[in-house]
């Protein structure tokens, strides 16, 4: 019979090393077998040479090489306070230490000198826990002296994340020019570009005699594209420091040409300033506004969707109920244009020319210059710093082909060339100096199989008949050089390639949808709400929230809206965040 006894029994005493160290510490305290004395200016600390050698490369090199200390019974440790050496020796023999604000700096220096890496990192962790916007800049300088990269990186991360508070600290104005430039060019900087400019001005004015020449280099670090044109051209362009610099005025003029001319190209020198958003500040968020919700009640709600938490946040309500207004955003400001204003009390309605604006900075609705012509059921589209209002229904209740353009720089509307054909509910998008109006319906509600193209710089229209276009009540959105037309009493999704002048079929939606909204965030198409035909061909309102990825040609559900909604606006707005965007 085979033996069942265990021939091999591996055993490891988990407590032996701890007990061994404990007993060695007792021997040290009783000065038994100690063979070396560490000397400071006012103290002598007996130790075991082999324990020191085993604990640190510094002592191993000292005692195991041909240094004179290898044969000495007494070793002087100059430049380290006695209480610090005592703490280090206690740490060597026990593995424990209490770090305080009074002790941390000399302890960190000693740990660095004596090559106790874990103790050094423990001190670094302690200092990282003390970080705040007021001391992070001094912590960065300290980390450079101590050569502590982990502390330096954490302190710099706080400096760019809490830039508003850091810029107000006393240490900020003492930064050198290279240090300030390093912060201002950081993609992680959590600040709006207006504040970036104001901060560099404050730094220069702290010592204007020696710093005013730095405006050339500092101004290049401001991402000018993300500054509102009014602030840029009325405040920044007129600042005496900016005007004193030829380079700054040349940059301002280049930006002016880019904003005012639809055909201007971005120069190589200006491109970093113009095209690159910061990872922290340029987080696009989805805003859903207006429309008709549950039981066709006109809604005053404005909602913001947080992709990270996947939750909806309520913004300030519209000042009044508007039926079939147009919605557009430009320079991170939401515009609600025109519409049919409704009174729930009297039941009266009036065609409106009013323009309301909402900024996420203030979360308050304001009025801008009203349109020249009241209209509703119209379309609005933005291009550069312009907003175009196209068609709709006017005060005479007739379908209009008129077009007007709003200049956000000067808060002015002007009449533009009318559309060749008046249509209702077309899909409209702007790309590459042109506005495209796809389909829609005529006064008799017949689909119009037509593409109308407006050349912005020439103020001229052209038209192209095509049987591919048959959309009504469908939104359009631009991703790269393709205009996506989504649904419109159909499940169909098609992409119009503006360069190749051809249509490409995409994956269909799940339902035949109309009166929905679509927008683009991070090169993905987000579709919200609308109405759809169910399996019994009955029209129902929808709270659907879906996303289309053109790279994979796949639709995914993002959940649902807080309520069923159609004839609303769906727009991307940029909000400031102190968390980075995912790579």
From Swiss-Prot:
CDD domains: BACK_KLHL38, BTB_POZ_KLHL38. This is Kelch-like protein 38. Disulfide bonds: none annotated. GO terms for molecular function: ubiquitin-like ligase-substrate adaptor activity. One of its GO terms (cellular component) is Cul3-RING ubiquitin ligase complex. Residues 34-101 form the BTB domain. Pfam families: BACK (PF07707), Beta-prop_ATRN-LZTR1 (PF24981), BTB (PF00651). The lineage of its organism: Eukaryota, Metazoa, Chordata, Craniata, Vertebrata. Kelch repeats lie at residues 285-332, 333-385, 386-433, 435-481, 482-523, 525-575. Residues 136-237 form the BACK domain. It comes from the Eukaryota. It comes from Danio rerio (Zebrafish). Keywords: Kelch repeat, Repeat.
